[in-house]
Amino acid sequence: MSLQSRLSGRLAQLRAAGQLLVPPRPRPGHLAGATRTRSSTCGPPAFLGVFGRRARTSAGVGAWGAAAVGRTAGVRTWAPLAMAAKVDLSTSTDWKEAKSFLKGLSDKQREEHYFCKDFVRLKKIPTWKEMAKGVAVKVEEPRYKKDKQLNEKISLLRSDITKLEVDAIVNAANSSLLGGGGVDGCIHRAAGPLLTDECRTLQSCKTGKAKITGGYRLPAKYVIHTVGPIAYGEPSASQAAELRSCYLSSLDLLLEHRLRSVAFPCISTGVFGYPCEAAAEIVLATLREWLEQHKDKVDRLIICVFLEKDEDIYRSRLPHYFPVA
């Protein structure tokens, strides 16, 4: 077998194995008539003549070209693959880098960065449909009709909202968005300083409005910050409208970012002084009416309370807005 035949056979083997990156350089004098040329671009040399014709693929792509196509298409090459640098959220000072890094992770990979290990998955949170089986409250004339599907979209939970693994949690913030007391401070401490760094770029928030940030070290992917009204004593009509707007503005962001689960704390009922019973009526009416319009766009709306008295209030009022079907 001639040297030319042996080289051609070896080239075919290398191409089949996906290991051909550059064409072999023939030794002088062994391939009579082979002419070495260089293309007009900055590309690699091409080998013409009998050797060059035999080295071409059926599609007319030369040996080097086939290797280049392989690299472009992601076929095996010897070039090392670029790997995204891992970010340590406990020490990082770049919120943009950290936020981008987290977006590229799967749900399972994100767990490594949670501030807690005892987080609560969405599937572990019972729906109102499940919870209502043990509710003794009977409503003779509920305000709304029975709807099994809506009862599967709403939940009441007494828990630490910072530990919920949902798409977003809502923060009852102050207008600065830089952290404060109550649930606001808890969320900022759990998420870490990167949350405050991103909030600083939002330049405050008006009462009744909402803004969204990453969740960072929280199990929740996002935090929706809203500012409730300050209402000591009997709330005015405008304050009631502002509280309703807090929930609607937060839900608007949920849809805008295509998120499907969200947990709300009790907004304005802490240091802002809004009466718990009056707030519950607004919250339940707002969520019920919103779900009637958008039930196919979300999986769960969670009312997450921290105090037993708030749980009792919502448990007694839920049947009026979400009658047991």
From Swiss-Prot:
Residues 141-322 form the Macro domain. Subject to competitive inhibition by the product ADP-ribose. This is ADP-ribose glycohydrolase MACROD1. One of its GO terms (biological process) is protein de-ADP-ribosylation. Its EC number is 3.1.1.106, 3.2.2.-. Its main location: nucleus. Overexpression may promote MCF-7 cells proliferation. There is an approximate one-third increase of the invasive capacity of MACROD1-overexpressing cells. The expression of CDH1 is repressed by MACROD1. Further analysis demonstrates that MACROD1 inhibits CDH1 transactivation in a dose-dependent manner. Inhibition is abolished by estrogen deprivation, indicating that the down-regulation of CDH1 transcription by MACROD1 requires ESR1 mediation. Binding of ESR1 to the CDH1 promoter is antagonized by MACROD1, suggesting that MACROD1 could interfere with ESR1-mediated transcription. It is found in: Nucleus. GO terms for molecular function: ADP-ribosylglutamate hydrolase activity; deacetylase activity; hydrolase activity, acting on glycosyl bonds; O-acetyl-ADP-ribose deacetylase activity. Belongs to the MacroD-type family. MacroD1/2-like subfamily. Changing N174A: Slightly reduced ADP-ribosyl hydrolase activity. Reduces O-acetyl-ADP-ribose deacetylase activity by 93%. No significant effect on affinity for substrate. It catalyses: 3''-O-acetyl-ADP-D-ribose + H2O = ADP-D-ribose + acetate + H(+); 2''-O-acetyl-ADP-D-ribose + H2O = ADP-D-ribose + acetate + H(+); 4-O-(ADP-D-ribosyl)-L-aspartyl-[protein] + H2O = L-aspartyl-[protein] + ADP-D-ribose + H(+); 5-O-(ADP-D-ribosyl)-L-glutamyl-[protein] + H2O = L-glutamyl-[protein] + ADP-D-ribose + H(+). Removes ADP-ribose from aspartate and glutamate residues in proteins bearing a single ADP-ribose moiety. Inactive towards proteins bearing poly-ADP-ribose. Deacetylates O-acetyl-ADP ribose, a signaling molecule generated by the deacetylation of acetylated lysine residues in histones and other proteins. Plays a role in estrogen signaling. Binds to androgen receptor (AR) and amplifies the transactivation function of AR in response to androgen. GO terms for cellular component: mitochondrion; nucleoplasm; nucleus. It holds the Pfam family Macro. Induction: Overexpressed by estrogens in breast cancer MCF-7 cells, probably via an activation of nuclear receptors for steroids (ESR1 but not ESR2). Significantly increased by estrogens in ESR1-positive Ishikawa endometrial cancer cells. Up-regulated in 17-beta-estradiol-responsive BG-1 ovarian cancer cells but down-regulated in estrogen-resistant SKOV3 ovarian cancer cells. Induced by androgen. It comes from the Eukaryota. InterPro entries: Macro_dom, Macro_dom-like. Interacts with ESR1; Interacts in a manner that is estrogen independent but is enhanced by estrogen. Interacts (via macro domain) with AR.
